[in-house]
Design a protein with these regions (language model features):
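N-terminal pre-domain/capping segments
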Residues: 1-111
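Short beta-strand elements of ligand-binding domains
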Residues: 113-115
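Surface-exposed cleft-lining segments at the edges of enzyme active sites
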Residues: 117-120
């Protein structure tokens, strides 16, 4: 029986409610108020991405916007949440494992989840 479970949401679910940093902060606070403890960050939503990636993800129903410009570490902490993991595409993990590890360490986490696809 699990007795100490962290309830978290995936950042990719928040694309439409994180159009600017203020809206992202408000959304994260609402997530905390709804009973969540944490968030799984998405690698291509916490780093600046190209226009093409933003358009492809938007067309796929997963708008990522310009969230890569936000200070996600501060936003998550201010909302009282924790980062549970980062999910990253397999191509980036294979090409830049040390960069992915440093990113995880920056957020104080030890888990990186593979999205199962290569970056666009």
């Amino acid at each position: 029986m699990i007795t100490n479970m962290t309830k978290a949401i995936q950042q990719i679910m928040l694309g439409t409610v994180t159009k600017n940093e203020k809206q992202a902060a408000e959304s994260l606070k609402r997530i905390k108020a709804a009973g969540y403890d944490g968030i799984e960050l998405n690698g291509f939503m916490i780093k600046p991405t190209s226009f093409l990636v933003r358009m492809l993800t938007k067309a796929a129903g997963m708008p990522v916007g310009k969230g890569g410009d936000y200070d996600w570490n501060a936003l998550v902490k201010e909302a009282g949440l924790v980062v549970t993991s980062i999910h990253e595409d397999l191509g980036t993990i294979k090409r830049e494992p040390e960069t992915v590890i440093r990113e995880a360490e920056k957020f104080g986490i030890k888990y990186v989840v593979i999205t199962g696809m290569y970056r666009f």
